[in-house]
Amino acid sequence: MILDLDIGNTLSKWRLKDVASSEIRSRGAVWTREEWRPGADIPDLDVVEAVRISSVARASVLRDTVALLRRQVGAVHVARSTPEALGVSCGYEEPARLGVDRWMGVLAGYQLTGGCCSVDCGSAITMDFVLPGGRHLGGYIIPGLRLMKESLKLGTRNVAIDPDSEADELLAPGRNTVEAVNHGIYMSAVSAVNRIYSEVCDREGVALPLLLTGGDARVVSRGLRVPHAIWPDMVYAGLETCFPMTAAERAGRLSGAPPPPPAPPLEKVRASLAFSMLL
């Protein structure tokens, strides 16, 4: 089995993948901790022959995690943000400072669609752009839905946005304080994603396929004007591209990859942008 770890600052996700069949056998999520408990926080390591890690947690968390795993697993691979990988050149002035989860999303997206805009809807909403030739432009970071709400210090009125709500409902004026806050936060997030996407595509002269991942991808998706696809395993797919271990991975078949979404006509993107600038 392959154990894939996506370690965040507060929440970490894992999955077990069968080497022979490439099937995902199990998956889960736990709070990030200094000391993992195999068999409790993560699967029993007796069945694991290799580990792949993407981590944006503190350096001490990654160091201690790797030390624990290497005592029991033969191969432990840690992803790093690099100046270039798999045909993509990093747009950051200091590539090592780009969050490795974002880099994994960029690499996975590029393998799937060529140029793309990858959006991770987590605690923060990050947007990264890579052109068809492999040049990563850099990206944007804005507060996610939860962080925006926490900044308002609502206390007991801090009711989460219902992920099953329809976009028309979430974009309508709120009829009480909780709705007004939730709808305002949602409007802010989706408006930012729509506007940033249009601005960058207009400036670069190319409309890019749009890929979403992260815990809030499904609800953010409902408010986007651009054709797109949701790819929950996009960070894991980045690990697969960097450290291919199964026959399917070596053949370029990435876990859970959606059909590549069509890019909208550039003229339509520009028309939408021009209209929004008149408002």
From Swiss-Prot:
Substrate binds at Y92, G99, V100, D101, R102, T177. InterPro entries: ATPase_NBD, Type_III_PanK. Gene3D superfamilies: 3.30.420.40. Its main location: cytoplasm. One of its GO terms (molecular function) is metal ion binding. HAMAP family: Pantothen_kinase_3. This is Type III pantothenate kinase. It comes from Chromohalobacter salexigens (strain ATCC BAA-138 / DSM 3043 / CIP 106854 / NCIMB 13768 / 1H11). The gene is coaX.
